[in-house]
C-alpha cells in the first residue's frame, strides 16, 4: 500500500492536533555542600521555612535557613551517600505525620512509620508537626485531675488535665519511672497517652515498651521513638510529632497525656543543628531561640473549651472539652536547676516535680523534694477528699525538715518536738512507693487519713510499710463498696469520714502493731 503526499500531511496534522503538551514546573536546586547531616542548596528560589525538600533516594530534608543565595537544610535520615552536585526539589509541603486511633498500641519513629514489626499503621489522616497553640479565648481553666498513682505527687503536687508539669532531676533519680507509672495508672481512666523517647538507647526504650505491655497500658499508648543513633533532625522533631498525635485526641473532645523524655536531649540536638547551620551561639552555645523551641511545644498542651471542640469537629462532638496534659522531663547536672535549659522550661511550665539524688540514694522513692516541688494550677483539679487530707501532709513534712535540721545541733528535745519529728519520719516513710504499683484515689485517701488522724503514732517506723500493705488488703477484702464509691465520686463528707474512721478503728483492734 502506497501513501500519497496528501494523506501523509493529513496524518501528520492529526498527530499534531492530538499531541498534548503538559509542562510540569518544579523548583529545582543543586546541593553545594554536605556536612554532618546538614546540606546547603543553591537555586531554590521559592522555598518556605520548614518546607520538605525532596532528595534522591526517596528521602527528605527540612529547610531551616533561608539565605540570600542558598538554603540550609537538615536531612531526615542517612546522608552518607549525598554528594555535591546532586539535584533536589521543593515539595511545597511542610512536614506532616499520621494521626488517629490506629496508632494506639504502636511504636513509631518521628515520621510516624512503624518500627515494632506489627505491619503498617492505620491512621485517620495527616497532621502538621508544627501547629499554633490554642488562644486564650479557646481555653478552659484546669479543674479535672490526672492521677499519677503516686501518694507523694497526687497529694502534694497534684496535676490537672491540660497542665504542663515538669519532672526535673539528675540522671538515675527515677524521672522515667515516675512518667511510666503515670501512663500505667491511666489504663482505666480513658486518658490516651503518648510517650516520646528522645536520644535514648534502643534497649532502654524496648524495656519501657515491654513494661507498658506487661501492665496492659500499651494498648492505650503511642510510643514515638528517636534513638540516640538517629540523626539530630529526627531527635529535634520527635516531640513535635508526638504532640501532633496527642492533639488529635484533644481537638476531638478527649483527654490525652504526653511525656517528653527528655527535652534536654532535644535541646542538645537543636544546638547541634544550629551550630552546623552556622547560627550564632549564645549561652552554653545554645542558639538564641532555644526558649521558643520549648515554649511553642509546651503551649500546645492545654484544656480547650466546648466551643473549640464543636468548631473543630464541625458539630459532630458536642458538650465536651478536650485536654492535652504534658509531663516534660529535664535532666540536670549535679542538681543545677539554674542552668539555661532547666530555667527556661521551669518558667514555661505550670510547676515542677523535683527529684533529688540524696533522697533517692537514702531509699526515699519516689525521691520527690516537697520543699521546691510545686503545682501552680493542679490544686483546683484535686478531688475533694485528696484536697482535704493532703494539707496536713505538706505541713507535717515542712515542719519535720525544719526540726530535723535543728535537732542535729540540739541534744535534748521536748516532747512536742520529738512527736513532730516522729510524725514527720513516719509520713516520709508512708509516702515511699514501689515502682509499677500505682494506687487508686481511695487507697491513697485511706492511707493519708491514717497519717492525718494519728493512727501511725503507735506503729514502729520499720513497720509502716507492712502496716500499709495489711490495711489495704483488709479494706479490699471487707470494704470494697466504700473504696469503689470514693474512687467514683472523690467526695468527702462527715459520713465518709466516719466510715474511714470505723475501718481504721476495726483494723487496729484486730491487729497489733
From Swiss-Prot:
Report one GO cellular component.
proton-transporting ATP synthase complex
Q: Which SUPFAM superfamilies match?
A: C-terminal domain of alpha and beta subunits of F1 ATP synthase, N-terminal domain of alpha and beta subunits of F1 ATP synthase, P-loop containing nucleoside triphosphate hydrolases
Query: Kind of enzyme, top EC level?
Result: translocase
What are the residue positions of the site described as Required for activity?
373
Membership in a protein family: Belongs to the ATPase alpha/beta chains family.
For this protein, the record's PANTHER family field holds: ATP SYNTHASE SUBUNIT ALPHA, MITOCHONDRIAL
Please report the name of this protein according to its UniProt entry: ATP synthase subunit alpha
Give the organism the record lists: Citrobacter koseri (strain ATCC BAA-895 / CDC 4225-83 / SGSC4696)
Amino acid at each position: 500500500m502506497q501513501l500519497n503526499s496528501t494523506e501523509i500531511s493529513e496524518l501528520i496534522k492529526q498527530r499534531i492536533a492530538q499531541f498534548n503538551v503538559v509542562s510540569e514546573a518544579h523548583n529545582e536546586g543543586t546541593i553545594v555542600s554536605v556536612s554532618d547531616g546538614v546540606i546547603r542548596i543553591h537555586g531554590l528560589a521559592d522555598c518556605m521555612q520548614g518546607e520538605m525538600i525532596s532528595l534522591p533516594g526517596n528521602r527528605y530534608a527540612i529547610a531551616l535557613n533561608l539565605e540570600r543565595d542558598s538554603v540550609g537544610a537538615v536531612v531526615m535520615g542517612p546522608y552518607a551517600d549525598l554528594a555535591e552536585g546532586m539535584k533536589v526539589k521543593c515539595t511545597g509541603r511542610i512536614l506532616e505525620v499520621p494521626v488517629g486511633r490506629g496508632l494506639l498500641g504502636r511504636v513509631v519513629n518521628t515520621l510516624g512509620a512503624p518500627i515494632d514489626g506489627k505491619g503498617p499503621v492505620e491512621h485517620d489522616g495527616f497532621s502538621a508537626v508544627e501547629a499554633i497553640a490554642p488562644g486564650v479565648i479557646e481555653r478552659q481553666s484546669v479543674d479535672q485531675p490526672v492521677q499519677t498513682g503516686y501518694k507523694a505527687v497526687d497529694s502534694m503536687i497534684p496535676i490537672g488535665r491540660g497542665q504542663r508539669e515538669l519532672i526535673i532531676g539528675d540522671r538515675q533519680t527515677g524521672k522515667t519511672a515516675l512518667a511510666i507509672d503515670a501512663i500505667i495508672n491511666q489504663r482505666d481512666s480513658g486518658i490516651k497517652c503518648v510517650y516520646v523517647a528522645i536520644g535514648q538507647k534502643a534497649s532502654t526504650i524496648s524495656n519501657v515498651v515491654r513494661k507498658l505491655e506487661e501492665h496492659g497500658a500499651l494498648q492505650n499508648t503511642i510510643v514515638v521513638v528517636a534513638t540516640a543513633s538517629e540523626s539530630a533532625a529526627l531527635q529535634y522533631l520527635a516531640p513535635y510529632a508526638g504532640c501532633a498525635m496527642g492533639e488529635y485526641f484533644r481537638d476531638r473532645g478527649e483527654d490525652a497525656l504526653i511525656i517528653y523524655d527528655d527535652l534536654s536531649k532535644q535541646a542538645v540536638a537543636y544546638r547541634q543543628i544550629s551550630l552546623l547551620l552556622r547560627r550564632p551561639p549564645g549561652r552554653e552555645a545554645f542558639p538564641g531561640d532555644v526558649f521558643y523551641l520549648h515554649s511553642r511545644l509546651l503551649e500546645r498542651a492545654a484544656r480547650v473549651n466546648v466551643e473549640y471542640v464543636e468548631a473543630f469537629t464541625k458539630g459532630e462532638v458536642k458538650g465536651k472539652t478536650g485536654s492535652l496534659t504534658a509531663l516534660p522531663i529535664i535532666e540536670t547536672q549535679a542538681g543545677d536547676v539554674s542552668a539555661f535549659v532547666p530555667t527556661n522550661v521551669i518558667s514555661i511550665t505550670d510547676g515542677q516535680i523535683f527529684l533529688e539524688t540524696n533522697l533517692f540514694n537514702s531509699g526515699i522513692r519516689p525521691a520527690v523534694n516537697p520543699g521546691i516541688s510545686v503545682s501552680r494550677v493542679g490544686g483546683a483539679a484535686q478531688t475533694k477528699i485528696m484536697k482535704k487530707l493532703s494539707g496536713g501532709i505538706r505541713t507535717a513534712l515542712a515542719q519535720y525538715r525544719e526540726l530535723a535540721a535543728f535537732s542535729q545541733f540540739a541534744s535534748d528535745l521536748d516532747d512536742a518536738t520529738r512527736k513532730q519529728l516522729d510524725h514527720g519520719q513516719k509520713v516520709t516513710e508512708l509516702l515511699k512507693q514501689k515502682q509499677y504499683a500505682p494506687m487508686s484515689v481511695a487507697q491513697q485517701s485511706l492511707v493519708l487519713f491514717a497519717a492525718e488522724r494519728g493512727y501511725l503514732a503507735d506503729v514502729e517506723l520499720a513497720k509502716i510499710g507492712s502496716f500499709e500493705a495489711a490495711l489495704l488488703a483488709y479494706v479490699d477484702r471487707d470494704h470494697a463498696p466504700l473504696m469503689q464509691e470514693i474512687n467514683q465520686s472523690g467526695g468527702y463528707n462527715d459520713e465518709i469520714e466516719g466510715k474511714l474512721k470505723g475501718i481504721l478503728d476495726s483494723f487496729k483492734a484486730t491487729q497489733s502493731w
